[in-house]
């Protein structure tokens, strides 16, 4: 039967991609349905209880700048905050937070339930309803059908999910949840390229059975950083410590002895696992020369005794898990509350997606999250927001909302996926971005909030706060440029005390702040030069923009040069064999990837600058050159 109401946007799956997708569509005014197999697991942290990190923290800030949920949710649920790379430049500094997974999940659910235009319904999705290569709705496990003008698939690891513990395996989307078998089978009959990936998780331990006195304590930063541009330290719950211990040779021997019963090393698991989050079996095999590996002992929350031993993800049999865990210092009497496991699942080749995350084969159908071959909550949330926004734009008959590699890590993420695809779970790093100095955590709102406002993602309160900040930055920078300090200033001794070399001639306050050793806040404490503005976000911008102005300008020039052909469109279904001079290999790669623009074509592995030149000449000669709007 058909449900009596129809929807603008239907989102299938309530994980990190699904929550951001449904909230984005609803914020933009679309009547949105979030379809989940279990309302109680909305926003569930299936693996590690943490948000952020190198590259990932940048994505969270960008989600927040566009009005998304993840940053606010972690600010209200994190039990430890740290700034990574704090001694390095602002481009690679990253925020990471340890979450209370119960608080996080509750905050997400509460936000979803109170979002205008959003309805939540509990039923697994078993099929997509198509008409003439266009999705028009979905069908659930009990046969109930929902009409939708656009559909976003955010099904995570649930498609034909297979959980492995030793040589035993069973169907599941994650421990305790059923796999999505029927939907996976239906989608295999559609024109999508599919493959299998694998990820894993460590056993969980009871903290009461551990000896923390022999471990290294790792406290959070004080004062603690804040993720959301709208947040404050007052949002944070109680802060507690994590701990560090290590594996040893005895641990490694237990693992080696169990490899003959490992699903990874006996060929039972076919999917490729995450390169940057390897299992402990992989670590001791690939890095056989290392006598120990670090383990971060991370509390799962304030009201539970469970801890997450980050660094020993495994799918070894349970008896081997027991032996390897109890061989670790501080874990000698450990009680395992949940076994570690690996999970294999279906994913779709993201090269079959447009930059908007819409399928190239089925109109109005969008994909986001692990279904596209990524790993991580942050990568999923970023894709979910973009997919949800574009599903809404499709309903409203608006242009697609896409971001370039020079605009956001979101742009880098989606461009990498849609252009290059992936054969292993894709994780974001700052090293993947060419324009890191422009794509900092601190300026995510400056880069994106105005764009989010234009399409309806950003509400009035955030928009007002953003404009106040920008006004503060501009007025203060004008003051710093126009305020001059003479070398006989009454406080010259205090000024020179901040400088490596004393002032030899007059200088503006801006000139002084450009010096690497000078801190804006310290300089403003000197009588007659300040006071510093109270807005800490604005003062951070003032310092970074002033100190790095030359480098930023050079990077902007570089972007302008590269953009000349970046946005040149390639006609759909273009026949590359028409171009004489292209090798068969190049033609095959271009046909396989179907790049939408010259920029995307240039980033395909094996496509040479000479091939791009031939393509440009042909398009120009035949009057096919045109830019994206």
UniProtKB/Swiss-Prot annotation:
InterPro entries, per database record: FAD/NAD-bd_sf, GIDA_C_N, MnmG, MnmG-rel, MnmG-rel_CS, MnmG_C, MnmG_C_subdom, MnmG_C_subdom_sf
Keywords per UniProt: Cytoplasm, FAD, Flavoprotein, NAD, tRNA processing
Subcellular location: Cytoplasm
Any Gene Ontology CC annotation: cytosol
Top-rank lineage group of the source organism: Bacteria
GO terms for MF: flavin adenine dinucleotide binding
Record flagged with keyword Metal-binding: no
Cofactor dependence: FAD
SMART domains xrefs: GIDA_assoc_3 (SM01228)
Biological processes per GO annotation: tRNA methylation; tRNA wobble uridine modification
Binding-site list for NAD(+): 273-287
Keyword Transcription regulation set for record: no
Annotated residues for binding of FAD: 13-18
Pfam families (UniProt xref): GIDA (PF01134), GIDA_C_1st (PF21680), SAM_GIDA_C (PF13932)
Gene3D superfamilies hit by this protein: FAD/NAD(P)-binding domain, GidA associated domain, C-terminal subdomain, tRNA uridine 5-carboxymethylaminomethyl modification enzyme MnmG/GidA
Coarse class of the protein's main subcellular location: cytoplasm
Similarity comment text for this entry: Belongs to the MnmG family.
Subunit structure: Homodimer. Heterotetramer of two MnmE and two MnmG subunits.
Function: NAD-binding protein involved in the addition of a carboxymethylaminomethyl (cmnm) group at the wobble position (U34) of certain tRNAs, forming tRNA-cmnm(5)s(2)U34.
NCBIfam families: mnmG_gidA
Entry protein name: tRNA uridine 5-carboxymethylaminomethyl modification enzyme MnmG
Organism: Colwellia psychrerythraea (strain 34H / ATCC BAA-681)
Origin organism lineage: Bacteria, Pseudomonadati, Pseudomonadota, Gammaproteobacteria, Alteromonadales
């Amino acid at each position: 039967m058909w449900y009596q109401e129809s929807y603008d946007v239907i989102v299938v799956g309530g994980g990190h991609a699904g929550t951001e997708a449904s909230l984005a569509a609803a914020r933009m005014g679309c009547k949105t349905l979030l379809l989940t197999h279990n309302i109680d697991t909305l926003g569930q942290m299936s693996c590690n209880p943490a948000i952020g990190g190198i590259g990932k923290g940048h994505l969270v800030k960008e989600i927040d700048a566009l009005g998304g949920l993840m940053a606010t949710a972690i600010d209200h649920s994190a039990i430890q905050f740290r700034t990574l790379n704090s001694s390095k430049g602002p481009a690679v500094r990253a925020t990471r937070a340890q979450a209370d997974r119960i608080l996080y999940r509750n905050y997400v659910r509460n936000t979803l339930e109170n979002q205008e235009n959003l309805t939540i319904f509990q039923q697994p999705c078993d099929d997509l309803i198509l008409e003439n290569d266009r999705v028009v709705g979905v069908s659930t496990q009990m046969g109930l059908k929902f009409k939708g003008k656009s559909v976003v698939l955010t099904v995570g690891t649930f498609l034909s999910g297979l959980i492995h513990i030793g040589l035993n395996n069973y169907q599941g989307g994650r421990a305790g949840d059923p796999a999505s078998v029927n939907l996976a089978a239906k989608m295999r009959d559609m024109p999508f390229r599919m493959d299998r990936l694998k990820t894993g998780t460590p056993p969980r331990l009871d903290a009461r059975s551990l000896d923390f006195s022999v471990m290294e304590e790792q406290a959070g930063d004080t004062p603690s950083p804040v993720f959301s541009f709208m947040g404050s330290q007052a949002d944070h719950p109680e802060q507690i410590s994590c701990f560090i211990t290590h594996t040893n040779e005895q641990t490694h021997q237990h693992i080696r002895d169990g490899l003959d019963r490992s699903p990874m090393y006996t060929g039972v698991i076919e999917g490729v696992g995450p390169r940057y989050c390897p299992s402990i079996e992989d670590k001791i095999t690939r890095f056989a020369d290392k006598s120990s590996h670090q383990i971060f002992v991370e509390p799962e929350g304030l009201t539970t005794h469970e801890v997450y031993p980050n660094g020993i993800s495994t799918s070894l049999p349970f008896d081997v898990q027991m032996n390897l865990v109890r061989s670790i210092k501080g874990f000698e009497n450990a009680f395992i509350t949940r076994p570690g496991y690996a999970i294999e699942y279906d994913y779709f080749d993201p090269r079959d997606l447009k930059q908007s995350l819409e399928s190239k084969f089925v109109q109005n159908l969008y994909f986001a999250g692990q279904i596209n071959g990524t790993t991580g909550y942050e990568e999923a949330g970023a894709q979910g927001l973009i997919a949800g926004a574009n599903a809404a734009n499709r309903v409203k008959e608006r242009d697609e909302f896409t971001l370039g590699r020079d605009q956001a890590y979101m742009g880098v993420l989606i461009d990498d996926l849609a252009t290059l695809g992936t054969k292993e779970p894709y994780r974001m790093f700052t090293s993947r971005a060419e324009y890191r100095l422009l794509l900092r955590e601190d300026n995510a709102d400056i880069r994106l909030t105005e764009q989010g406002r234009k399409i309806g993602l950003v509400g009035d309160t955030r928009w007002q706060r953003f404009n106040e900040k920008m006004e503060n930055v501009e007025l203060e920078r004008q003051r710093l440029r126009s305020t001059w300090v003479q070398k006989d200033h009454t406080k010259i001794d205090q000024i020179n005390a901040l400088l490596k070399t004393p002032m030899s001639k007059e200088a503006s306050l801006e000139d002084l702040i450009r010096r690497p050793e000078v801190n804006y806040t310290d300089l403003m404490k000197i009588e007659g030069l300040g006071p510093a503005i109270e807005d800490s976000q604005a003062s951070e911008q003032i310092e970074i923009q002033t100190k790095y102005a030359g480098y930023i300008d050079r990077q902007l020039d570089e972007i302008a040069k590269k953009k000349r052909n970046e946005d040149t469109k390639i006609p759909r279904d273009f026949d590359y064999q028409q171009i004489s001079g292209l090798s068969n290999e190049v033609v095959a790669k271009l046909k396989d990837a179907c790049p939408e623009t010259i920029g995307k074509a240039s980033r395909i592995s094996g496509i040479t600058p000479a091939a791009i030149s031939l393509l440009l000449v042909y398009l120009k000669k035949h009057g096919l050159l045109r830019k994206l709007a």
